[in-house]
Curated annotation (Swiss-Prot):
UniProt GO BP: translation
UniProt function note: This is one of the proteins that bind and probably mediate the attachment of the 5S RNA into the large ribosomal subunit, where it forms part of the central protuberance.
Protein name (database record): Large ribosomal subunit protein uL18
Gene Ontology MF terms: 5S rRNA binding; structural constituent of ribosome
Assembly description: Part of the 50S ribosomal subunit; part of the 5S rRNA/L5/L18/L25 subcomplex. Contacts the 5S and 23S rRNAs.
Species, as recorded: Pseudomonas fluorescens (strain SBW25)
Short name of any one Pfam family annotated for the protein: Ribosomal_L18p
Superkingdom as given in the UniProt entry: Bacteria
Family of the protein in this entry: Belongs to the universal ribosomal protein uL18 family.
Keywords: Ribonucleoprotein, Ribosomal protein, RNA-binding, rRNA-binding
InterPro entries, A to Z: Ribosomal_uL18_bac-type, Ribosomal_uL18_bac/euk
Any single Gene Ontology cellular-component annotation: cytosolic large ribosomal subunit
Length: 116
């Protein structure tokens, strides 16, 4: 693995351990060069409560690797999480910088009603 990826994974592991100690539901984000994925994971980490990505049928047709797509994924995962009874989450950025697509997803989820 490259040094860049190793440092990202170390940052992610450190943040996830803290969230596990606090026993909070987390909104986990993963971004690749072409897609972005978001999952709401239970406090014990055993169950995915809601998920959305640019591979979903509603979002697959448009552009998938830009800020607009990340905004749509954020709105979709927030509505699905609220339907599952989740209103408060901890934001797990998986070691990615809080910038660009990751920030757009977080802002859209906040606007749709999730509390971080």
């Amino acid at each position: 693995m490259t040094d860049k990826k190793v440092t990202r994974l170390r940052r992610a592991r450190k943040a996830r351990l803290k969230m596990h100690e606090l026993e909070v539901v987390r909104l986990c984000v993963y971004r690749s060069s072409q897609h972005i994925y978001a999952q709401v994971i239970s406090a014990d980490g055993n169950k995915v409560l809601a998920s959305a990505s640019t591979l979903d049928k509603e979002l697959r047709d448009g552009a998938t690797g830009n800020i607009d797509a990340a905004t749509k994924v954020g709105q979709l995962v927030a509505t699905r999480a609220k339907a599952a009874g989740v209103s408060q989450v901890a934001f797990d950025r998986s070691g990615f910088k809080y910038h660009g697509r990751v920030k757009a997803l977080a802002d859209a989820a906040r606007e749709a009603g999730l509390e971080f």
